[in-house]
């Protein structure tokens, strides 16, 4: 053994070849600060070996290196910029020394080589991968860019176009595609990976392969003539702005950095990369996006804990077909859980089966499944007008019309036909679970399972715990949601649960703005372009369905009369009374026609202004800040109340429910991250200016207390014990 640390070992093979093996204590290898320092120490040892002829890098895990340790990111980003800069210079010196070894080097890549893992293999002369390997640089998805030389080496290895596509989009690619673009030199079966790598290395040692020629382009300026460069980078910048927009600066920064570095060799190009990385790391967007990654890990970890030792059901059932029931049945069947789909109406069953078939057809068109698999999946959805076979289901999801009497009757009826262990769940969006549980003899077996529309696209499932719901029931439903490929978040019961409870105050803020003379089009524009929502409130109401929203608004008003009841007609009432239900009937706040692909196309409708004049002040211009404050303060206050009342268990779960369930702008990170970013004291001071608008604008006491003590919702990232920047002699 030449060198050994907790995460890597260095030892001799035959023929003067040394092997560097990444083997961290956990299930995966990460390129954390300690491993980077250890790599530097191993290289010091290697540099002293006069008999060294070649170096092989490999992993002892199922994946090569999954990336940097993202749990360290917020701590690193909290370091003073000059210290982070210093550490990056230190780290890059290590990768340069790997690249500059006076012998040929090769990486044998199995599984993932992402982020820092990809940057590590870019520093070797040759790369060989197994077929399941995935290689890429996902940093821009976290609000940063490659920091270990990825933006320097990848363009010089692949050419600018292919490299920009990977870096700007934060992509990873499979082994065969990596071979096509020149990212790897060979793809071989996993059991032959090391032998193939050694064969290439020995050919290089024997002079049959020119390893110095393989290395040289990575050290030199990018080979692009001025015309090619202008075209390549102009197109890339245009596409990035179109896709990422102004709220996500990392992709454009990466493209501009690669462009600026194109005329330089490695040393100067790395300086530009580091100079671009440090400001991105200190940005609010990076903190928010890294926070989302960490929160996602936390939420998935909570789901694992809650469903520990519990398997997903072998058979499920959905009561109520149509679009929603069909969507749930499709998702269940697609992920391997056969499902009975029951409805009293043959037309609804046809609609549900057609929905499942349509979604499977899309999978077929994209090459995700073949015709046989499609037929097999569809065969696991059993449509029925009666309860035949219902006793086989371990979990039954009720998805009938959003009417408490109808839901209660259906649940009570099915309970008489099933075993004492069978779990019942309601896909209600607003009706309290405790209210529905009154119709059941076994309320401990009952909970809410709120899917979001469209089911196949929306990652969140709200699992609602009623007063009498057992832990066993929650475990079964969480396991089912996880098997379906969803992110389950458990919330406690109240009208609207969490997501809809906090959505309707936002829509109420919109309604009050329109009442006071704001143009709904301006509100939509500001909330989309400035705040970053995927759609503004008027457009959202049209997509959800104004009849659906009108009904839910009434339920919320009964549930929270002190805040959500209103004594005036608003824009939603006017739309509803005039049967303008949104996209579903082609007219709402906007008019909808079909585009060439059959999708609804939004257009202005002048009739709407005349209708809204019944309930609005004369049109007047509001500032962007006013529009954002008047819509967001009610939502933010309600989100905080949900935490204070124990409806949600943590800021992380609240923020992920908002991002996954409502499309809350990821670059803000969720309401709690947003509050931490602007500061609770600043928020309270701003909200004070709007308290005259009513109860929705009153800041909850817990948030006032945080403001007084200058506290945050997320813990401040602890400083890393030792970010080593000294190289042993």
From Swiss-Prot:
Keyword Transferase among record annotations: no
Catalytic activity line of the entry: a (3S)-3-hydroxyacyl-CoA + NAD(+) = a 3-oxoacyl-CoA + NADH + H(+); a (3S)-3-hydroxyacyl-CoA = a (2E)-enoyl-CoA + H2O; a 4-saturated-(3S)-3-hydroxyacyl-CoA = a (3E)-enoyl-CoA + H2O; (3S)-3-hydroxybutanoyl-CoA = (3R)-3-hydroxybutanoyl-CoA
Gene Ontology terms describing biological process: fatty acid beta-oxidation
Superkingdom: Bacteria
UniProt: substrate binding residues: 296, 500, 660
Gene Ontology cellular-component terms listed: fatty acid beta-oxidation multienzyme complex
A Pfam match: 3HCDH_N
Positions annotated as active site in the UniProt record: 450 (for 3-hydroxyacyl-coa dehydrogenase activity)
Binding-site residues for NAD(+), renumbered to this chain: 324, 343, 400-402, 407, 429, 453
Region (3-hydroxyacyl-CoA dehydrogenase) residue spans: 311-729
Keywords: Fatty acid metabolism, Isomerase, Lipid degradation, Lipid metabolism, Lyase, Multifunctional enzyme, NAD, Oxidoreductase
Pathway: Lipid metabolism; fatty acid beta-oxidation
Enzyme Commission code(s) on record: 4.2.1.17, 5.1.2.3, 5.3.3.8, 1.1.1.35
InterPro entries linked to this entry: 3-OHacyl-CoA_DH_CS (IPR006180), 3-OHacyl-CoA_DH_NAD-bd (IPR006176), 3HC_DH_C (IPR006108), 6-PGluconate_DH-like_C_sf (IPR008927), ClpP/crotonase-like_dom_sf (IPR029045), Enoyl-CoA_hyd/isom_CS (IPR018376), Enoyl-CoA_hydra/iso (IPR001753), FA_oxidation_alpha_subunit (IPR050136)
Entry's transmembrane regions: none
Stretches for region Enoyl-CoA hydratase/isomerase: 1-189
Residue(s) at site: Important for catalytic activity: 119, 139
Family: In the N-terminal section; belongs to the enoyl-CoA hydratase/isomerase family.
NCBIfam families: FadB (TIGR02437), PRK11730.1 (NF008727)
Function in brief: Involved in the aerobic and anaerobic degradation of long-chain fatty acids via beta-oxidation cycle. Catalyzes the formation of 3-oxoacyl-CoA from enoyl-CoA via L-3-hydroxyacyl-CoA. It can also use D-3-hydroxyacyl-CoA and cis-3-enoyl-CoA as substrate.
SUBUNIT field: Heterotetramer of two alpha chains (FadB) and two beta chains (FadA).
The name this protein goes by in its record: Fatty acid oxidation complex subunit alpha
């Amino acid at each position: 053994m030449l060198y050994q640390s907790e995460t890597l070992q260095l030892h001799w093979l035959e023929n003067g070849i040394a092997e560097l093996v990444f083997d961290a204590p956990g299930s995966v290898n990460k390129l954390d600060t300690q491993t980077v320092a250890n790599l530097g120490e191993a290289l010091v040892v290697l540099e002293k070996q006069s008999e060294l002829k070649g170096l092989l890098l490999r992993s002892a895990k199922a994946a090569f290196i999954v990336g940097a340790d993202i749990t360290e990111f917020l701590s690193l980003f909290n370091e003073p910029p000059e210290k982070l800069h210093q550490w990056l210079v230190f780290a890059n010196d290590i990768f340069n020394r790997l690249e500059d070894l006076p012998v040929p080097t090769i990486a044998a890549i199995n599984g993932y080589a992402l982020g820092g893992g990809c940057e590590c293999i870019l520093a070797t002369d040759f790369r060989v991968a197994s077929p399941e390997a995935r290689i890429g640089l996902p940093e821009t998805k976290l609000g940063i860019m490659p920091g270990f030389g990825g933006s320097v080496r990848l363009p010089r290895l692949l050419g600018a176009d292919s490299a920009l596509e990977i870096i700007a989009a934060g992509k990873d690619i499979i082994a065969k595609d990596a071979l096509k673009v020149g990212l790897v030199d060979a793809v071989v079966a996993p059991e032959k990976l090391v032998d193939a790598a050694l064969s290439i290395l020995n050919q290089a040692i024997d002079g049959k392969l020119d390893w110095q020629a393989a290395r040289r382009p990575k050290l030199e300026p990018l080979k692009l003539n001025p015309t090619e460069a202008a075209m390549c980078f102009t197109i890339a910048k245009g596409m990035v702005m179109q896709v990422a927009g102004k709220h996500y600066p990392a992709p454009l920064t990466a493209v501009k950095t690669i462009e600026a570095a194109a005329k330089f060799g490695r040393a100067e190009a790395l300086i530009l990369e580091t100079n671009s990385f440090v400001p991105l790391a200190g940005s609010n967007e990076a903190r928010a996006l890294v926070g989302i990654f960490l929160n996602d890990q936390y939420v998935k970890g909570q789901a694992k804990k809650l469903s520990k030792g519990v398997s997903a059901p072998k058979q499920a059932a959905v009561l109520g077909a149509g679009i929603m029931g069909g969507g749930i049945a499709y998702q269940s069947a697609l992920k391997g859980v056969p499902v009975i789909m029951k409805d009293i109406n043959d037309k609804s069953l046809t609609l549900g089966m057609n929905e499942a078939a349509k979604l499977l057809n899309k999978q077929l068109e994209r090459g995700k499944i073949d015709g046989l698999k499609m037929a097999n999946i569809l065969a696991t959805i059993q449509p029925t007008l009666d309860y035949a076979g219902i006793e086989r289901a371990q979990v039954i999801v009720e998805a009938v019309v959003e009417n408490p009497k109808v839901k209660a009757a259906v649940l009570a009826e099915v309970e008489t036909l099933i075993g004492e262990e069978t779990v019942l769940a309601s896909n209600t969006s607003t009706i309290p679970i405790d209210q529905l549980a009154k119709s059941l003899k076994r309320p401990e077996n009952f909970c809410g399972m709120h899917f979001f529309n469209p089911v196949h696209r929306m990652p969140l499932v709200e699992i609602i715990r009623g007063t009498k719901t057992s832990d066993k029931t929650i475990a079964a439903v969480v396991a089912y949601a996880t098997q379906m490929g969803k992110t389950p978040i458990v919330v406690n019961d109240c009208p609207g649960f969490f997501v809809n409870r906090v959505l309707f105050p936002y829509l109420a803020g919109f309604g009050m703005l329109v009442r006071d003379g704001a143009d709904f089009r301006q509100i939509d524009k500001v909330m989309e372009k400035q705040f970053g929502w995927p759609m503004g409130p008027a457009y959202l109401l049209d997509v959800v369905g104004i009849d659906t929203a009108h009904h839910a608004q009434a339920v919320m008003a009964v549930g929270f009369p002190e805040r959500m009841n209103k004594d005036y007609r608003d824009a939603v009432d006017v739309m509803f009374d005039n049967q303008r239900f949104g996209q579903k009937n082609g007219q709402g706040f906007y008019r909808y026609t079909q585009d060439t692909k059959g999708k609804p196309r939004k257009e202005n409708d002048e009739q709407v202004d005349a209708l809204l004049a019944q309930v609005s002040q004369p049109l007047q211009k509001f500032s962007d800040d006013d529009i954002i404050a008047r819509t967001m303060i009610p939502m933010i206050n309600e989100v905080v109340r949900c935490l204070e009342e124990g409806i949600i268990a943590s800021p992380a779960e609240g923020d992920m429910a908002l991002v996954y369930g409502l499309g809350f702008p990821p670059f803000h990170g969720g309401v709690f991250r947003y509050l931490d970013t602007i500061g609770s004291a600043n928020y309270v001071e701003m909200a004070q200016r709007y308290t005259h608008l009513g109860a929705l604008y009153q800041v909850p006491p817990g948030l006032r207390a945080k403001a007084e003590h200058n506290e945050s919702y997320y813990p401040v990232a602890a400083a890393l014990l030792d970010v080593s920047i000294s190289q042993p002699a």
